[in-house]
Amino acid sequence: YVQESISKIPKILEELAGLELEPPRWHFIGQLQRNKAKPVAAHFDLVETVDRAALGAELDRRAAEAGRSLEVLLQVNLSGEPQKGGVDPEALPALLAASRAWSQLRAIGLMTVPAAASDPEASRPAFARLRALRDALRDAEGGQALRELSMGMSADFEVAIEEGATIIRVGTALFGARAP
């Protein structure tokens, strides 16, 4: 999805030209492989899916090459589903510690994708757990950083907001389902 996303940026900027708006902040959402770090570091402002130290280090290197700084969210796998990205909750403190070595990246929060469910309430335990993880890490850090919680999508964003989401992902609700 990296190239697809990057190709849409000029079109969106063209549509926004002439409007008195703050410039958009581009978020990259989706599993990211290290070999795609260069274009992501060059075009996006926030990467929501950093789930391993090696990926963060590569993004950091590529951001430095591009003369940019990026914000990142650390993705946590709370569903236990191997096909979903994210660090295991037990390994999250180590990933946060590794993030301190990144000079061009700043970890500003956490992100999760809960297990798919037809009832939005089924996502509540995962959202509450992510908030609890964030709060525990913030307490351990003396209240520093980790201000964002990206959780909730088109089907369950109301529950996510009730549980403290600061970023929701509602592309399907806004734009419809992706083409196959």
Spans of features found by a protein language model:
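Conserved alpha/beta-domain cores
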Residues: V2-F157, I161-E163, F175-A177
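Active-site loop ensemble at the mouth of alpha/beta enzyme cores that anchors a bound cofactor
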Residues: P180
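Active-site-proximal glycine-rich helix-loop-beta segment
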Residues: G164-T166, G171
